[in-house]
Amino acid sequence: MPTYTPKAGDVTRTWYVIDATDVVLGRLAVQAANLLRGKHKPTFAPHVDGGDFVIIINAEKIALSGNKLTNKFAYRHSGFPGGLSKRSIGEQLEKFPTRTVEKAIVGMLPKNKLGRQIERKLKVYAGAEHPHAAQQPIPFEIKQVAQ
């Protein structure tokens, strides 16, 4: 009997919604990346996009452990000499709450064409509302929340 190899057309995708309220950023990112890649499915193959869609709500209420709000920085470069700018994660969470969560999750995905394709299935929203009610997303519970 030949070994089963999953194909892109054989995949059934589910929609999950994750509430990020008081969840540590790294723990949320690991769970979301596993759902996006499809590592929770028995048909997982690293070369096939077999993952599910993930909606993250309340990204503005994410928790960070330790003093990361003030001591960890997000760097950007304009491309010009001396164009490096930095902003603390606390400042970035206030101004762009979805960007911090997206960057943490995308950093755990493959850095190739497949990773960019998987990244499109991630939807992050700062508040509690999202426009994907028609997809009937299943709530995904993350048990470890910040104390």
From Swiss-Prot:
This protein's record includes keyword GTP-binding: no
Pfam families cross-referenced by the UniProt entry: Ribosomal_L13
GO molecular function: mRNA binding; structural constituent of ribosome
Listed SUPFAM superfamilies: Ribosomal protein L13
Family matches, as Gene3D superfamilies: Ribosomal protein L13 (3.90.1180.10)
Gene Ontology cellular-component terms listed: cytosolic large ribosomal subunit
Gene Ontology biological-process annotations: negative regulation of translation; translation
Keywords: Ribonucleoprotein, Ribosomal protein
Domain of life: Bacteria
Subunit relationships: Part of the 50S ribosomal subunit.
Family of the protein in this entry: Belongs to the universal ribosomal protein uL13 family.
PANTHER family: LARGE RIBOSOMAL SUBUNIT PROTEIN UL13M, RIBOSOMAL PROTEIN L13
Function: This protein is one of the early assembly proteins of the 50S ribosomal subunit, although it is not seen to bind rRNA by itself. It is important during the early stages of 50S assembly.
Protein name in UniProt: Large ribosomal subunit protein uL13
